[in-house]
């Protein structure tokens, strides 16, 4: 059996102490040798991103996981800054920008609303699949494989056993993230 691929888990939450769901989700990742958990807010509290360091981390990993809360139909500000600065032309896209080609992108998102809020008749009027399209397009721009996102709806209100079950499933996926035909 081959080694599991190296995973870079980019965690972006500006108030991690307030997010029980994200703390629980991170627990299995922190136990796996093939996963590098990189807390962007802990690493860059001043938002001064070391672009070369971040690009080197990306080069060293095959699967990139973006774990964050869903803020204003997007991601927290530091992750947006990271995406704009690190995934630069000539590195991740454009002429000569092939560093991420063939790697995998998976978004792991927590929301403050239930799943039915992301529906034409719901508060947000659109399904989550549509709202995540900018991330999917960014992955495509970088020539990365878009993996089906993991969405933890209504994260603050989940019963502990449901949250534990989702964290367990997340941990199992992290241990073997690639599609079966590529393992």
Swiss-Prot record:
GO CC, any one term: plasma membrane
Protein's UniProt keywords contain Hydrolase: no
Keywords: Cell inner membrane, Cell membrane, Membrane, NAD, Oxidoreductase
Keyword Translocase: no
Group of enzyme by EC: oxidoreductase
Principal place of residence: membrane
Membrane topology according to the record: Peripheral membrane protein
Subcellular location: Cell inner membrane
Pfam families: Flavodoxin_2
GO-annotated biological processes: positive regulation of potassium ion transmembrane transport; potassium ion transport
Catalysed reactions listed for this entry: a quinone + NADH + H(+) = a quinol + NAD(+); a quinone + NADPH + H(+) = a quinol + NADP(+)
Domain of life: Bacteria
Record GO terms (molecular function): electron transfer activity; FMN binding; NADH:ubiquinone reductase (non-electrogenic) activity; NADPH dehydrogenase (quinone) activity
EC number: 1.6.5.2
InterPro entries the record matches: Flavodoxin_fold, Flavoprotein-like_sf, K_H_efflux_KefG, KefG/KefF
Annotated family: Belongs to the NAD(P)H dehydrogenase (quinone) family. KefG subfamily.
Complexes and interactors: Interacts with KefB.
HAMAP family: K_H_efflux_KefG
Known function: Regulatory subunit of a potassium efflux system that confers protection against electrophiles. Required for full activity of KefB.
Protein name: Glutathione-regulated potassium-efflux system ancillary protein KefG
Organism, scientific name: Pectobacterium carotovorum subsp. carotovorum (strain PC1)
Gene name for this UniProt entry: kefG
């Amino acid at each position: 059996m081959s080694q599991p691929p190296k995973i870079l888990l980019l965690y972006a939450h500006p108030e991690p102490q307030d997010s029980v769901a994200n703390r629980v989700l991170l627990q299995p990742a922190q136990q796996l040798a093939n996963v590098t958990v990189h807390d962007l807010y802990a690493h860059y509290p001043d938002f001064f991103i070391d672009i070369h360091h971040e690009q080197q981390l990306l080069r060293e990993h095959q699967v990139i996981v973006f774990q964050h809360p869903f803020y204003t139909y997007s991601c927290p500000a530091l992750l947006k800054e990271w995406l704009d600065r690190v995934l630069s032309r000539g590195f991740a896209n454009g002429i000569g920008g092939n560093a991420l080609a063939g790697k995998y992108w998976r978004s792991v998102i927590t929301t403050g609303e239930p799943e039915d809020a992301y529906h034409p008749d719901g508060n947000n009027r659109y399904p989550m699949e549509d709202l995540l399209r900018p991330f999917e397009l960014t992955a495509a721009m970088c020539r990365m494989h878009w993996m089906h996102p993991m969405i933890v709806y209504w994260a603050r209100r989940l019963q502990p056993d449901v949250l534990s079950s989702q964290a367990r499933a997340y941990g199992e996926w992290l241990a073997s993230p690639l599609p079966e035909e590529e393992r």
